[in-house]
């Protein structure tokens, strides 16, 4: 992994120097695969540099450039749109996979002969055939994992749909409101760039027209909507923050009239405070949620465009804090001064009214005939997806699919059913665990994992963790709960599960066996 990172860092430097020389010499040229890969490596995280090979990113870049050449709308895409909203493989914090390279031909055929606008609508219909909404945990499934199981929460549906749009060269980005202002919870969806402008759609929730979704009215009451753009992006939208890897932008203006909020922070003596933290908070789930935190500039100010509703402000610096309320029902600048007049160990009682934006209207037009036709399509797409999910393991066929005569058959069958589209990998794992006389331990290990883990983890990853946990015979197994939860369990937090356990075991084993201190543990 470290060698891979070092190799790619040196290669990235060489490619960047070459590109700089070409620019300085005035030799503008069409983007090449090397240019595209260089851009990806310039801004990707160190984890992605280590987890995925150069060939992986090269293959994805080749397909992205192919889409730009072959799709009729490719000529509309300038380099900025292409680099930031088509080329990147990553959408959120999902595991990267081969979705783009596997499904380019399929999706290209699906949109053949369509305009860019109609292609975006059609891709969303395809996504609906494959995935529907189901709540789950915070870890984001990859596009192929969502397809495998036919389901995903809104963040996974939107990750999947963005990947599909980008595959055919349609610029797309995942947009989310960190918290609704008028009700609890949040939501994520997709924006697509078609024919010169950004429009929104509900991911895997196709409508007959863009800018139509079940959340049109909720969106009209939102205070903030933002998206993470891969790389150092300099577009027309407000920038919330820049990092080495991405640019966070505010796109609330695409949905509602906005106001500019200006917060000036002063200390208890009236002097402006630079570098203070200013949290712009939305009331949700019984808390003041810091949707955005900014630093004050040299004038002691921080500003943010939002919807037209109340917003609580929390400012802090140097062990002191203060609060304020942004309130106006008009699309005009709203300015307040927050004084840091409380010590951070001091409790504070606050009695305020928080008013969300009033319901508005986001225009969306579709004829009654188009709406009726869309409903028929949705029903057909549901039937296609349900026909696929009907192939998953159930109580009727579980024992036959398992094919093991064991006292643990009931528990093993339950895991096959829970595995949904991943049942073949889980079956292979249990068969191999049984071959190693470790089926009981394997089933206990599966019980430590989330349902999502069961539904997208490969056999080799699970078997690697199981075999390595069974190796150290000096570990006391008298307290099985501790052994199962803290030795056998392959997951630590939200990391990608990888087959690394045996590598570590083979490295450390020579230092452990024969070591009396280790044997006393």
Regions found by a protein language model. Give the residues of each.
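C-terminal motif of bacterial Sec signal peptides marking the signal peptidase cleavage site
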Residues: 24-26
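Hydrophobic/aromatic-rich core segments of domains that either
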Residues: 29, 109-110, 114, 119-125, ...
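Secondary-structure boundary elements
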Residues: 29-149, 184-185, 406-521
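Extracellular beta-sheet/turn segments enriched in Thr/Pro/Gly and aliphatic residues
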Residues: 242-254, 327-368
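A short, amphipathic beta-strand motif
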Residues: 259-270
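Short, ordered, surface-exposed loop/turn motifs in non-cytosolic proteins
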Residues: 268-287, 308-310
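Short, acidic Ser/Thr/Gly-rich low-complexity loop/linker segments typical of extracellular
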Residues: 284-306
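Short Pro-Gly-centered beta-turn/loop motif in secreted/extracellular proteins
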Residues: 301-313, 317-320, 327-330
């Amino acid at each position: 992994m470290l060698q891979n990172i070092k190799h790619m860092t040196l290669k990235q430097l060489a490619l960047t120097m070459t590109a700089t020389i070409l620019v300085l010499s005035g030799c503008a040229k069409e983007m090449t695969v090397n240019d595209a890969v260089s851009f990806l490596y310039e801004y990707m995280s160190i984890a992605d540099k280590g987890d995925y090979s150069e060939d992986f990113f090269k293959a994805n870049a080749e397909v992205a450039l192919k889409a730009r050449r072959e799709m009729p709308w490719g000529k509309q895409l300038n380099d900025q749109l292409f680099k930031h909203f088509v080329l990147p493989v990553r959408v959120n914090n999902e595991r990267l996979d081969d979705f783009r390279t596997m499904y380019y031909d399929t999706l290209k055929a699906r949109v053949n002969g369509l305009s860019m606008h109609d292609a975006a609508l059609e891709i969303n219909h395809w996504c609906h055939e494959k995935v529907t909404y189901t709540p789950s945990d915070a870890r984001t499934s990859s596009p192929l994992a969502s397809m495998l199981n036919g389901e995903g929460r809104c963040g996974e549906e939107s990750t999947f749909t963005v990947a599909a749009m980008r595959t055919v060269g349609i610029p797309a980005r995942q947009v989310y409101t960190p918290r609704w202002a008028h009700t609890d919870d949040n939501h994520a969806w997709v924006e697509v760039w078609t024919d010169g402008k950004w429009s929104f759609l509900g991911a895997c929730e196709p409508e007959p027209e863009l800018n139509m979704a079940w959340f049109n009215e909720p969106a009209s009451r939102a205070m903030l909507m933002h998206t993470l753009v891969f790389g150092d992006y300099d577009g027309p939208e407000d920038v919330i923050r820049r990092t080495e890897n991405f640019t966070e932008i505010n796109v609330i203006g695409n949905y509602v009239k906005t106001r500019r909020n200006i917060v000036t922070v002063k200390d208890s003596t009236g002097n402006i405070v630079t570098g203070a933290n200013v949290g712009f908070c939305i009331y949700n789930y019984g808390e003041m949620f810091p949707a955005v935190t900014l630093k004050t500039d040299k004038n002691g100010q921080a500003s943010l465009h939002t919807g037209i509703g109340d917003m609580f402000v929390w400012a802090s610096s140097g062990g002191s804090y203060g609060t304020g309320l942004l309130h106006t029902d008009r699309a005009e600048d709203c300015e307040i001064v927050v004084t840091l007049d409380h010590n951070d160990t001091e409790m504070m009682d606050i009695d305020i009214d928080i008013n969300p934006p009033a319901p508005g209207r986001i225009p969306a037009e579709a004829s009654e005939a188009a709406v009726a036709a869309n409903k028929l399509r949705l029903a057909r797409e549901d039937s296609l997806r349900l026909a696929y999910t009907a192939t998953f393991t159930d109580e009727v066929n579980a024992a036959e699919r398992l094919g093991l005569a064991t006292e643990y058959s009931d528990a093993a069958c339950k895991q096959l059913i829970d595995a949904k589209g991943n049942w073949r990998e889980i079956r292979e794992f249990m068969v191999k665990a049984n071959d190693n006389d470790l089926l009981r331990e394997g089933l206990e290990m599966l019980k430590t994992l989330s349902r999502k883990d069961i539904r997208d983890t490969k056999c080799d990853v699970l078997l690697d963790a199981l075999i390595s946990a069974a190796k150290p015979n000096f570990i006391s197994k008298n307290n099985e709960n501790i052994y199962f939860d803290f030795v056998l369990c392959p997951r630590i937090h939200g990391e990608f599960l990888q087959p690394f356990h045996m590598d570590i075991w083979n490295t450390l084993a020579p230092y452990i066996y024969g070591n009396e201190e280790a044997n006393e543990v």
